[in-house]
Amino acid sequence: MSIERSTEVMATYLGEVLGKRRFELIPDFVDEEMLDHATGMRGPSALHAHATGFCENIPGVEIKVEDIFATDDAAFGIWNWKGDPIQSMGSSANGNPVFPQRVLSVFRLRNGMLIDYEAFVDAGQVRAQISAP
């Protein structure tokens, strides 16, 4: 497709879907066969479950997009969030909750539609949270 479309898809997801809770936009950019690696589910309903679950766990979450990089068939969004999660994403060995707040979202696209989504968290941030006293 185009770099512009790839950028638009990522910007819509981060800024509109997560940032403004506009979940109704998901079918506009998600292919029916899209694989969400976080849930193992496919299609727009998979991303809807992922996004709504994230936002419900962090009421009033604020999203800040650091940067978006794109090619014709991929987009990479570096972003962070602020808020107070209801449930942590895990616990360290000493019982500290783990809340990685800096994320890299990786989208693979085909014909301008999202077909594969993976998210990666900041390892340094996780390590600091796990080792905190």
What role is predicted for each listed range?
Residues 1-133:
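C-terminal and inter-domain tail/linker signature
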